[in-house]
């Protein structure tokens, strides 16, 4: 692997790590907002869908990953906050 290829690979890894940190921050922020109870159920659902779109913009083609990793957390937070048991 050439030095240029290695530098490009390191840059791509840095960018992916930055995107992942940003996504984690946005997920945590959305969960806090949902758990605050100040939103309607419809607004909470809209936040989740908007965040999913943002996640897919950062990580195209990773719909399944979002649905497996983050959607259950949001469903649990919504169920607990809005007492949907």
Task: List the predicted regions and their residue ranges.
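N-terminal acidic leader/helix
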Residues: 4-41
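Residue-identity detector for glycine
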Residues: 37-38, 45, 61
């Amino acid at each position: 692997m050439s030095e240029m290829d290695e530098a490009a690979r390191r840059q791509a890894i840095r960018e992916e790590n930055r995107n992942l940190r940003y996504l984690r921050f946005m997920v945590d922020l959305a969960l806090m907002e949902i758990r605050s109870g100040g939103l309607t159920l419809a607004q909470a659902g809209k936040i989740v869908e908007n965040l999913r779109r943002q996640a897919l913009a950062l990580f195209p083609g990773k719909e399944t990953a979002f649905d497996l990793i983050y959607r259950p957390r949001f469903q649990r937070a919504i169920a607990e906050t809005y007492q949907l048991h």
